Amino acid sequence: MQTLLKLLSDGRFHSGEELGALLGVSRSAVWKRLEGFERDYGMVVQRVRGRGYRLEEPLSIISPRSDSGPWPLDVLFSIDSTNAEVLRRLSAGAVAPFAVLGERQTAGRGRRGRQWESPFGSNLYYTLGITVRGGAQELEGMSLVVGLAVAKAIQALGVKDVGLKWPNDVLVGGKKIAGILLELTGDPADICSVAIGIGINVNMRTAYAIDQPWTSVREVQGGQVDRNELLQALESQLAHALSRHRERGFAASREEWESLHLWQGRQVTLSTVANNIVGRALGIDERGALRLLVDGKEQSYSGGELSLRLSDDS
């Protein structure tokens, strides 16, 4: 499957005879595998008599690293969830840091139990497993630091109008382009393992399970994007951001994060499990908590199942 897909990833026509010879199988076997692509991966294969087969459009396949990278990276053809896989490996004693990237996810998930749409070869589904030895102090603001790193990686590709929504959504033009999900095992007050899940909409053009305005790097750039280039930028930004966070805490990133905060000074509604809180967004504190002006008094909010939305049109 993987070899055939790589052969077709250039978007050009390939005859069944050519593909069969390269794979060492019959033309009918090639046909069956292509049917499997369409059935199992939702990919469109064009068939033209006398020319052969090609994918509806080229695919940007993740290539093996040309260098060592900041940590080991395992690229998987298909996985239920990169977060779930990293948590399994951490529980089995894998040595952190390490990362897992899936070409597709069959059970991708986001914050608050939401499904994360994960078509094959379209986006980045990436999870970094790390060990945190600084306890709660190191965990404070970590998701915001990761969001900032993701925003800067997207900016590195020339994307404009990139902004952040507390706590960790990345938006372009007011539409979601990336999200972060942190899950941990162990004692958060002492030593624990953290799975830092990152999903970035890269080349996706159609989605059926996204219940909010969204966009992709391809949509805003006007053409297909090399996912390898974005992956390299992401890992570089992540390595720098997490190192700074470990050494200096969230305070070192606070000003830069607020400079990208789209709702700074806006009237917002913060939804909690118990109620809705309306106030003006003042920014974030040195722990990454959201600062709101509520009924003339400043309040701070962090952790738990919190959701923020605009409540004004200014």
Predicted features along the sequence, with ranges:
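A short, compositionally biased micro-patch
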Residues: 48, 119, 165, 284-285
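Long, positively charged amphipathic alpha-helical accessory segments at protein N-termini or as interdomain linkers
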Residues: 1-26, 32-33, 134-162, 172-314
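A short coil-to-beta-strand element that immediately follows conserved catalytic motifs
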Residues: 98, 160-165
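Conserved active-site carboxylates
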Residues: 169
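N-terminal lobe of the biotin/lipoate ligase/transferase fold
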Residues: 1-156
